[in-house]
Every structure is written in C-alpha cells, then in structure tokens.
Amino acid sequence: MDENKQKALAAALGQIEKQFGKGSIMRLGDNRAMDVETISTGSLSLDIALGAGGLPMGRIVEIFGPESSGKTTLTLELIAAAQREGKTCAFIDAEHALDPVYAKKLGVNIDELLVSQPDTGEQALEICDALARSGAVDVIVVDSVAALTPKAEIEGEMGDSHMGLQARMLSQAMRKLTGNLKQSNCMCIFINQIRMKIGVMFGNPETTTGGNALKFYASVRLDIRRTGAIKEGEEVVGNETRIKVVKNKIAAPFKEANTQIMYGQGFNREGELIDLGVKHKMVEKSGAWYSYNGDKIGQGKANACKYLKENPEIAKTLDKKLREMLLNPENMQLIAETSSAADDVEFGAVPEEF
C-alpha cells in the first residue's frame, strides 16, 4: 500500500475509534483475544469433542434433544463449573420447572444463582438482554425456547392462530443479543425441544422450535440423546448419553461424545477419565485390574471409579494430562494416526456392577 493510502487508512481508523470507541475496528492479527475463552461443560469427553475445552464465552449456544435426555443437567453442570471459577450465572426458567434440590446435588451454588420465572417470552428475552448489557453476568441459561410464549398468544383465546409470532420475536432478540453478549463476554445458552415436521417422506423429520434465527446465530449447537440405561442389578441408576456437536464455529464440527449421566449425580466424570486414560495409554489395564503410574487403583471399572472419587487430586492430575494431550493441536495429528491401531474404547461403556 502506498504512503497516501496508508495515511488515509490511519485517519479513517482514528476517526472510527474516536466516534465508536477503542476496539471498534482492528486488524485481525492485532486481536489479543483470538483464542476464545471457554467454560468446561463438566464432561471431559464433550470438552474434547468441542475442540476448545468447553463452550465459548461471548457467544450464543443451543442445546436440543428429546425429553429427559439431559439438556438441563448439562447446563446445570456448566453453571456449577462456571461458579467454581468465580463467575456469575443466571437461569431464566420459562418452563417454571427448575428443581433447586437437584441443582444443588450437581454442585450449583443456589444461593448465588440468579433465577427468573418470566410471564411472557418478551419479558424473558428483555431480562436476558438486560443481564447481558449489565456486563456483570457471565453465563445466562434460557430453559426453554419452546416455553417462550409471545404476550399476544397468552392474552388471546385458545385456538387462536399466531403464525410465526414466536419466530419473529426470537429473530429480533437474536439481532439485539449477539452484539451485547460479545461486548460483555457473556455466554447465553438456549435449551430447545424437538418437534416433528408433518409430511416429510425423506430425510430427517425432526426440527427445533422457534424458527431458523437461533440456528444461524448460535456458535455451537449440541444434539443430546439418551442411548441406553445404566443398571445396578435391576434398578436403573443412569442413562447412556450421546452428545453430537452439529454446529461449531470455534473448532471442527460433527464430533461426538459418549458419556453417562447418573441420576442425582450428573456426569460420570471418573468413568470418562478411566475410559480416556485407557484409550490414550495413561491408565494401564491388565485383565480386570486398572493401574495408574504403576499403582493398582481397582479391580473392575466400578472400583477404579471409586478410587478416583476418593482421591480427587489423582483424578485432577489425570484430567489435566488428558486435556493437555487431547486439546493440543500438535498432538491431534499423532492421535489421529495412532487411533486406528489402538483399541477403541466407548466413553459411555456400561460400567460393571457397582
């Protein structure tokens, strides 16, 4: 670029920054925050599938799936992880179904959690926008999009037609929210439900509620499904769960995480550590015995999980080593080359009898 153009560009940039504030325009390479800040989801295998170690701050995230698949559990696990880092979280409970006892069991500090149970969809989204603009809230969860009922529909008669009303309301909210969330570095998670499209002969008949705007504005979309039951004798104690990253703007999409959600406990973190540790040769398995750093930690997976639960420092060290290995781009190619030779281990394998 010649000298005159450089001067003109510098003057234009200076004028823009003077009018709209510092940071309103910059060269892409000058942005110090190119590495997106993330918060752990509470599941190691999901953090790895996301490719960045968690869900991104300052972005919109959509989590959808069938009923009782673990959508709210996933968000409560993330809130607990965020609170442990000293972050402020809010839960907009449009379904009026948040269970504080269950939230507390998952590690959520309910005394510090901000909760709103709005009357209308517009009120819920206005509260969400106000919290984002405040700059004091780090994580907002909206449960759920399907329950964001427009005021006109609530005040109208049963059977009245309100074509596209909710979709228009959400589309306007997305336009307002996106910039505010980015400026305040606040993550907004929308939980969504699944509906069936009528008359679809070929392809997937499933769709999510609230129109298409949320699909476009979301940086990450997670599809969570229950794939089986975990039994202790005859009693069902948890669910096998598969989480697919169907959209990802911060890393490669379409990866899957298989995990377990135990009733009243949340993610089976110790089970994930054992499975990933064995897969990547950090935990040795000889017959039914599991060993870590040469020391036997249990006979059978259930006992190995129990050992890690009783020794949180060892579990924390193993978690840190696995994250450093699996989230380091330099190691990803090596892992991809050796994974075909290694024995595949299902993250969500059914644990042996407790």
From Swiss-Prot:
Main location: cytoplasm
InterPro entries: AAA+_ATPase, DNA_recomb/repair_RecA, DNA_recomb/repair_RecA_CS, P-loop_NTPase, RecA-like_C, RecA-like_N, RecA_ATP-bd, RecA_C_sf
An annotated GO BP: DNA repair
Record flagged with keyword Magnesium: no
Pfam families assigned: RecA, RecA_C
Residues annotated for ATP binding in this entry: 65-72
Compartment annotation: Cytoplasm
One Gene Ontology CC term in the entry: cytoplasm
UniProt cross-references to SMART domains, sorted A to Z: AAA
Gene Ontology MF terms: ATP binding; ATP hydrolysis activity; ATP-dependent DNA damage sensor activity; damaged DNA binding; single-stranded DNA binding
Keywords, in A-Z order: ATP-binding, Cytoplasm, DNA damage, DNA recombination, DNA repair, DNA-binding, Nucleotide-binding, SOS response
SUPFAM superfamilies given in the database record: P-loop containing nucleoside triphosphate hydrolases, RecA protein, C-terminal domain
Homology family: Belongs to the RecA family.
Role according to the record: Can catalyze the hydrolysis of ATP in the presence of single-stranded DNA, the ATP-dependent uptake of single-stranded DNA by duplex DNA, and the ATP-dependent hybridization of homologous single-stranded DNAs. It interacts with LexA causing its activation and leading to its autocatalytic cleavage.
Protein name per Swiss-Prot or TrEMBL: Protein RecA
Gene: recA
